Amino acid sequence: SGVVRFFLNEQKGWKLSVVDAALGTRYYKLETTSDGGHNWTTVNEDPFDGNGGAGEGIQFFDEQFGFIGLSGASQTHSSIYVTKDGGKTLKEIELPMDTVTEYPPHMQEYGFTLEDYQYLEMPQQDGENYTIHVMTQSGEMEGLVFTSEDQGENWIFTGVFAE
């Protein structure tokens, strides 16, 4: 169905609902509930500023602060958005790719360049910090790591991962 849901607790939740779809691309609105999903109200009619794709995920850490992801149909690129007002406004995260100083082990062997690293996984909480893994496509076993110490406002390159 394309709907992506996240519940912070038994009552409070958010969902991306498809409002239009064409050629594998979906366009969404963001809705919220305070009664466990019985009633939903629209928080944002166009959370991705006209961009379409596949809803990648929703994560909220309290009733205001969270991340929402949108990936391209090919799963080779994605965008992560941060909100600090429960989803009313979203800001696309821009990672400082020009600060990368280390590369994944097989990058050159596979013929990749830094420009190929456009798939951002949903952020993971690590204590007070948040990390994003950036890969060439969904499910990759190695890539770049960026960390935010200020709830997604600013990101710094912190290394590579290889599983």
Model regions: which residues?
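Entry beta-strands of beta-propeller and related beta-repeat scaffolds
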Residues: 11-15, 64-68, 126-132
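Short coil/turn segments at the loop-to-beta-strand junctions that recur within blades
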Residues: 47-52, 96-101, 162-163
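Repeated scaffold domains used in trafficking and secretory/extracellular systems
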Residues: 1-5, 51-59, 100-121
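Structural motif
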Residues: 23-29, 75-81, 140-144
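Hydrophilic extracytoplasmic domains
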Residues: 115-163
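Asp-box/BNR beta-propeller loop motif
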Residues: 31-43, 81-94, 146-157
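Eukaryotic tandem repeat interaction scaffolds
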Residues: 40-71, 77-82, 92
